[in-house]
UniProtKB/Swiss-Prot annotation:
Name of the protein in its database record: Methionine--tRNA ligase
S-S bonds: none
Residues making up the signal peptide according to the UniProt record: none
Gene name per UniProt: metG
Any one Gene Ontology BP term: methionyl-tRNA aminoacylation
Reactions accelerated catalytically: tRNA(Met) + L-methionine + ATP = L-methionyl-tRNA(Met) + AMP + diphosphate
Family membership: Belongs to the class-I aminoacyl-tRNA synthetase family. MetG type 2B subfamily.
Length: 657
C-alpha cells in the first residue's frame, strides 16, 4: 500500500548576502515538520531553494566584477553549506536559474498572455531595488516633498531609498479573481495561518480592491525573458512563486513528481511575504486551473532588542557561530522552543544560554546521566525488563507518558513547536521528580525491594526513550546519543508508532558503562558576552555613515511638549491603508484616538495592552479620514519603527519629563 504523501516548502531565499538566523528559523521549522511527518509514516518531499533573478543580483555581480552566475554559484555554495550544517533533510534544492525552472516560467507566462490574464500596459511607481518591490505614495516612509509633490521616500519594509520608475510592463489581471479568491477563503478557513494573517490580507489588500499586478520589467536584463517579447523580463514574484511546481517537473516530459505530490500541504514563509503566497499565488494557480495548496503558514520575525533582524541593517546573528560553539542541537532547540511559531520573538544571548543550561544540560542531560549511573550502580549495568506498574507513581508516569504523546501530537499538527517542546519538558521534569519520590537509593538498601527498584529503573529508561523519540524531529544528535548510551538499538523502538503502548522494553538491556554528558554546562557570563560580541561586527569604512544631528534646543522648547503614559486598549487597521493603525489609548482621565503609521511593523493584536508614551498636546489632525489626537512615540532605525514601551507600573496619565 502506497504511503500518504506530504509536500512542504520553505520560501526560496534571495542570495544577495550571507543568510542569518532568521533564514535558518524558517528552514529548521520546515525540517522539523518533514522529520515529524516521516516518523508518522508519510512519504515526505521537502523543498527549499534560492530566488536568483532581479536587478539587485545584477548590480551585486557587477560590483563584485563577476558574471551573475559566478556570483550566484559562490553564494549558493555557502547556503547549501549552512543547510548541511543545520542537517536540513530537504529532498530537493531549486535554483530559479536552472533550465527546469526557466522553462516552466516561460510557458506559464505565455499561457496566461494567450488566455488574456496578462496584458501589456505602462507602469509608474516608487521602486526599491533591494526589496524588488513597488510602493504607492501612501506606503512610503519619510516621504520627501518639493512644491507639494512627493519626489522621494523610503521603503516601509527595509528603509531603503525608492526611485520613481516608469516603464512599459505586462500586467496580471488579478482583480477579476477577487470573488473566487474570497470564496476559496470561505471554503478553506484554515488556508492562511495564523488567522490574524488572513484578516490582514482581506482587510488591507482585498477589500480595498486588488490592483492588477505589474509582472515584467524592461530596465534590467537578469531574469527569465518573455519569449514573445524578449525585452521584457518576468517580474521576480511570478518567477519565484512558480518554483513550487517547477521543482516537481510541472510542464516537463516527466510530471510524475507533480502528479504525486501536488498540491502542497504547507508553504512556510516569514510574514512579510504572506501577501504574495496568499493572494498572488492562489490566483496564479486558479488561472492555470491547478489545485491550490492546503495551507500557507506565515511565521513571525526574529527580532533583536533594537528591532527586526536584517542583512541590510547588520544586526544579525550568524547561525554558524552558534553551531560551531554550542552544537547543532542547542541551536535548533532554542529556535523552536524560545520563539513561538507564528508570532514575533526576540533573540537574546541570555535566553539562549539559559535554555542550553537549564533545559538541555540540567533537565534532560542530568536525567540521562543519573539514570544510567543508577542502573550501573544497582544492577551492574543490566537494566531489568519492564514488569508493568507496581506502584501508583508508576501508573501516574505511564498515564502521563501517553497523555504527553497526545498533547505533543496536537501541538505539532498545528505547528505550535514551542508548545510541543514545553509538553516534552514537563514530562522530563516530572520524571526527574519521580526519582526523588521513589528514592532508589533507599530501595537499594532493602533486598526485598529489588523488584520495585528494578521497575523504577525500567520506568526511568522508558520515560527517557519516550522523550528521545519525541525530540527526534527537533534534535538530530541527542536522541541518537541517548539510544546509544541506553543500548536501545532496535529501530522500531525509536519510531513514533512505538509510543502507542507504554513499556516495550520487555527484555533486559545492558546500558553503557560510563554515561557521557550530552550537553556540557556553559559559563553563563562568559558565553553571553561571547554571543553579544559576535553580534556586533565592526563596521567597514564603507558602511560607516555620519548621522546628522538636529539643531540644539533649550529646555523651554522641550517643556512645550506634553508626554504622558497610556495603555493601548484597542487597535484596528485603517481602511485602504497598509501603513496606518487606528488606536484607542487610555490616559486615565480620558480616552483618545490616535492614528499611527506602524502597521508595517505591528498587527493590532501585537500592541493591545502595551504601555506607551503619548504626545498629548499636538493639534488634532485627520489621516485617511480618521481623527488623530496625539502621537505615540516610537524609535526608528534604518526605516524600522519600534514602539517606546513603558514599565507597566507607571500609571496611565503620568507625565513623562
Amino acid at each position: 500500500m502506497a504511503k500518504e504523501t506530504f509536500y512542504i516548502t520553505t520560501p526560496i531565499y534571495y542570495p544577495s548576502g550571507n543568510l542569518h538566523i532568521g533564514h535558518a528559523y524558517s528552514t529548521v521549522a520546515g525540517d522539523v515538520i518533514a522529520r515529524y511527518k516521516r516518523m508518522q509514516g508519510y512519504d515526505v518531499r521537502y523543498l527549499t531553494g534560492t530566488d536568483e533573478h532581479g536587478q539587485k543580483i545584477q548590480e551585486k555581480a557587477q560590483k563584485a566584477g563577476k558574471t551573475e552566475i559566478e556570483y550566484l554559484d559562490e553564494m549558493i555554495a555557502g547556503i547549501k553549506q549552512l543547510w548541511a550544517k543545520l542537517e536540513i533533510s530537504n529532498d530537493d534544492f531549486i535554483r530559479t536559474t536552472e533550465e527546469r525552472h526557466k522553462h516552466v516560467v516561460e510557458q506559464v507566462f505565455e499561457r496566461l498572455l494567450k488566455q488574456g490574464d496578462i496584458y501589456l500596459g505602462e507602469y509608474e511607481g516608487w521602486y526599491s531595488v533591494p526589496d524588488e518591490t513597488y510602493y504607492t505614495e501612501s506606503q512610503l516612509v519619510d516621504p520627501q516633498y518639493e512644491n507639494g509633490k512627493i519626489i522621494g521616500g523610503k521603503s516601509p519594509d527595509s528603509g531603503h531609498e525608492v526611485e520613481l520608475v516608469k516603464e512599459e510592463s505586462y500586467f496580471f489581471n488579478i482583480s477579476k479573481y477577487t470573488d473566487r479568491l474570497l470564496e476559496f477563503y470561505d471554503q478553506n478557513p484554515d488556508f492562511i495561518q495564523p488567522p490574524s494573517r488572513k484578516n490582514e490580507m482581506i482587510n488591507n489588500f482585498i477589500k480595498p480592491g486588488l490592483a492588477d499586478l505589474a509582472v515584467s520589467r524592461t530596465s534590467f536584463n537578469w531574469g527569465v525573458h518573455v519569449p514573445s517579447n524578449p525585452k521584457h523580463v518576468v517580474y521576480v514574484w511570478i518567477d519565484a512563486l512558480v518554483n513550487y511546481i517547477s521543482a516537481l517537473g510541472y510542464l516537463s516530459d516527466d510530471e510524475s513528481l507533480f502528479n504525486k505530490y501536488w498540491p502542497a500541504d504547507i508553504h512556510l514563509m516569514a510574514k512579510e511575504i504572506v501577501r504574495f503566497h496568499s493572494i498572488i499565488w492562489p490566483i496564479l494557480l486558479m488561472a492555470l486551473d491547478l489545485p491550490l495548496p492546503k495551507k500557507v503558514f506565515a511565521h513571525g520575525w526574529i527580532l533583536m532588542k533594537d528591532g527586526k533582524m536584517s542583512k541590510s541593517k547588520g544586526n544579525v546573528v550568524d547561525p554558524n557561530i552558534l553551531i560551531d560553539r554550542y552544537g547543532l542541537d542547542a541551536t535548533r532547540y532554542y529556535l523552536m522552543r524560545e520563539l513561538p511559531f507564528g508570532s514575533d520573538g526576540v533573540f537574546t544571548p541570555e535566553a539562549f544560554v539559559e535554555r542550553t543550561n537549564f533545559d538541555l544540560a540540567n533537565d534532560l542531560g542530568n536525567l540521562v546521566n543519573r539514570t544510567i549511573s543508577m542502573v550501573n550502580k544497582y544492577f551492574d549495568g543490566e537494566l531489568p525488563a519492564y514488569q508493568g506498574p507496581l506502584h501508583e507513581l508508576d501508573e501516574e508516569m505511564e498515564a502521563m507518558a501517553l497523555e504527553t504523546v497526545k498533547s505533543y501530537t496536537e501541538s505539532m499538527e498545528s505547528l505550535q513547536f514551542s508548545v510541543a517542546l514545553s509538553t516534552v519538558w514537563k514530562f522530563i521534569s516530572r520524571t526527574n521528580k519521580y526519582i526523588d519520590e521513589t528514592t532508589p537509593w533507599v530501595l537499594a538498601k532493602d533486598d526485598s525491594q529489588k523488584d520495585m527498584l528494578g521497575n523504577v529503573m525500567a520506568h526511568l529508561v522508558e520515560n527517557i526513550r519516550y522523550a528521545a523519540v519525541l525530540l527526534r524531529p527537533f534534535l538530530t544528535h541527542a536522541p541518537k546519543e541517548i539510544f546509544e548510551q541506553l543500548n536501545i538499538n532496535n529501530p522500531q523502538f525509536m519510531e513514533f508508532s512505538s509510543l502507542e503502548q507504554y513499556g516495550v522494553l520487555t527484555e533486559s538491556i545492558m546500558v553503557t558503562g560510563q554515561p557521557k554528558p550530552i550537553f556540557p554546562r556553559l559559563d553563563s557570563e562568559a558565553e553571553i558576552a561571547y554571543i553579544k560580541e559576535s553580534m556586533q561586527p565592526p563596521a567597514t569604512e564603507e558602511e560607516k555613515e555620519e548621522i546628522p544631528s538636529k539643531p540644539q534646543i533649550d529646555i523651554k522648547d522641550f517643556d512645550k511638549v506634553e508626554i504622558k503614559a497610556a495603555t493601548i486598549i484597542d487597535a484596528e487597521h485603517v481602511k485602504k491603508s497598509d501603513k496606518l493603525l487606528k488606536i484607542q489609548v487610555d490616559l486615565d482621565s480620558e480616552q483618545r484616538q490616535i492614528v499611527s503609521g506602524i502597521a508595517k511593523f505591528y498587527t493590532p493584536d501585537d500592541i493591545i495592552g502595551k504601555k506607551v508614551a503619548v504626545v498629548t498636546n499636538l493639534k488634532p489632525a485627520k489621516l485617511m479620514g480618521q481623527k488623530s489626537e496625539g502621537m505615540i512615540l516610537s524609535a526608528e532605525k534604518d526605516g524600522v519603527l519600534t514602539l517606546v514601551s513603558l514599565p507597566s507600573a507607571i500609571p496611565n496619565g503620568a507625565v513623562i519629563k
